[in-house]
Swiss-Prot record:
This is Ribosomal RNA small subunit methyltransferase H. It is found in: Cytoplasm. Keywords: Cytoplasm, Methyltransferase, rRNA processing, S-adenosyl-L-methionine, Transferase. The gene is rsmH. Signal peptide: none annotated. The keyword Repeat does not apply. It catalyses: cytidine(1402) in 16S rRNA + S-adenosyl-L-methionine = N(4)-methylcytidine(1402) in 16S rRNA + S-adenosyl-L-homocysteine + H(+). S-adenosyl-L-methionine binds at G50, G51, H52, D69, F97, D113, Q120.
Length: 304
């Protein structure tokens, strides 16, 4: 397999999935925060189906976008959704945003929405959701080898417990890992979710927050190396900004938000613009419940 650092900017070849539609969160706040300028070149590091990119391209007719995603289905969907705004204004790069070979002062602004796209949750075969029966997959880049099934069925009890605690912040990590090892192998998401539910008192098994929520988060983070990728990306991305350019990162859980907060604060390239993160207005939360945990942080590259 070719190293993703060597991948050229691509023309998407995979046909778009008509149902790959994702509602971007904090859209207006993000666009306002980036302060889009005429003729600007922007990096959408997690393009998804293209929601944020569409708003950026709509601001001025000469704005350009370089769009990244690990998911080939997302790249195809974004290319289709954004084509009417001018394909010559768009370049796509498939891979991990931490591996993008950016250049010093290449971009007027950078946006990354770290949430899992709604279609990834809603397509059972992707294995991200415990609410739909599917294989234990969870790969954003489906060319990689490690899956959630491999972790669940092959890792030791101690390794699983540590994973659930560190990446899921799950207080019952030890008992859950022990039960999983006793009951494995698991083939489907719903099998695993039901096994996890059996480790908590009956009154907590089917409440508003499913007992498997944090375990599934931990597995997804591990499969996709999400936190280490975010750290590597934030170590590089500020240098890719032009002086006065801005970077906005939307996170969805405390582990991500903590990394963004301290990477922004400690960067010698950036001035933090958001002392506290921006969160969705109540109206947006009601329209899109998945936006409830979103947090936007913004920073600006120093002028000199």
């Amino acid at each position: 397999m070719t190293n993703s650092c060597d991948r050229p900017l691509i023309t998407p070849l995979e046909p778009p999935n008509a149902s790959f539609i994702h509602i971007s969160v904090l859209s207006q706040e993000t666009i306002a925060g980036l302060n889009i300028i005429p003729g600007g070149h922007y990096l959408d590091a997690t393009v998804g189906s293209g929601g944020h990119s569409r708003l950026i391209l709509a601001t001025f007719p000469d704005v350009r976008i370089t769009a990244i995603d690990r998911d080939s289905q997302a790249i195809a969907a974004a290319a289709s959704n954004l084509a009417e705004l001018g394909s010559e204004r768009l370049k796509f790069w498939q891979g991990n945003f931490a591996d993008y070979p950016g250049k010093i002062a290449e971009f007027s602004g950078i946006i990354a929405d770290l949430g899992v796209s709604s279609p990834q949750f809603d397509f059972p075969e992707r294995g991200f959701s415990f609410r739909h029966e599917g294989a234990l997959d969870m790969r954003m880049d489906q060319t990689q080898s490690l899956t959630a099934g491999e972790i669940i069925n092959q890792w030791s009890e101690t390794a699983l417990a540590d994973l659930f605690y560190q990446y899921g912040e799950e207080r019952r990590s030890r008992s859950m890992a022990k039960h999983i090892v006793q009951q494995r192998p698991f083939k489907t998401t719903t099998q695993l979710a039901e096994a996890i539910a059996q480790t908590v008192p009956p009154k907590y098994r089917y409440g508003r927050i499913h007992p498997a929520t944090r375990v599934f988060q931990a597995l997804r983070i591990a499969v996709n190396e999400e936190l280490s990728s975010l750290e590597r990306f934030l170590d590089q991305a500020p240098q890719w900004l032009q002086p006065g350019g801005r970077i906005g990162i939307i996170s969805f859980h405390s582990l991500e938000d903590r990394i963004v907060k301290y990477r922004f604060r400690d960067s010698s390239w950036l001035t933090v613009m958001t002392k506290k993160p921006i969160i969705p207005q109540r109206e947006e939360q009601l329209k899109n419940p998945r936006s409830r945990s979103a947090k936007l942080r913004l920073a600006e590259r120093h002028l000199v």
